[in-house]
């Protein structure tokens, strides 16, 4: 199965168990881990001369889809909230995405397994680029106000009432 086609399962394992959705949960967890590893590889392979190639983000999003990439990045930033090398903007953005705690039998949060372990400064740069990429995609998809007006029908004549019988005096 292609990783991009696996739905992002946002709920913890106990919820998945109670609702008979363990297969969805497990598939999503595997995809999250693979996405985390792909992000680390993309950063490693695309960082040269103090610059992160913009293709790094596109490459991972093409493989996993923007929802999963952003979920993994939000989880990473939330878990590294203490790190001052991650920008305030990215920390504020990460808080807008729900990532439920998912404790195992020993109390360890399973979300720790898909935290990106690249240098925090590079991770921050990747998050910023990913957010910018999504904003650009949304801007391209959203028609401008002028385009919307051009698409509207030009029938501006007043509608006649059903009770209208002709010109009144």
List each language-model region with its residue ranges.
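Gram-negative host-targeted secretion-system effectors, predominantly Type III and Type IV
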Residues: 1-168
């Amino acid at each position: 199965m292609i990783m991009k086609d696996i739905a992002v399962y946002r709920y913890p394992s106990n919820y998945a168990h109670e609702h008979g959705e363990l297969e969805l949960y497990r598939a999503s967890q595997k995809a999250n881990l693979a996405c985390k590893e792909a992000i680390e590889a993309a950063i490693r392979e695309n960082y040269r001369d103090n610059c992160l190639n913009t293709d790094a983000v596109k490459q991972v999003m093409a493989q996993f889809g923007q929802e999963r990439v952003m979920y993994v990045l939000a989880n990473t930033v939330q878990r590294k909230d203490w790190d001052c090398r991650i920008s305030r903007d990215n920390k504020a953005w990460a808080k807008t995405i729900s990532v439920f705690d998912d404790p195992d039998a020993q109390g360890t949060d399973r979300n720790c397994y898909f935290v990106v372990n690249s240098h925090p400064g590079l991770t921050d740069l990747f998050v910023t680029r990913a957010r910018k990429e999504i904003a650009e995609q949304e801007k391209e998809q959203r028609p401008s106000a002028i385009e919307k007006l051009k698409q509207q029908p030009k029938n501006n004549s007043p509608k006649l009432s059903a009770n209208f019988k002709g010109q009144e005096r």
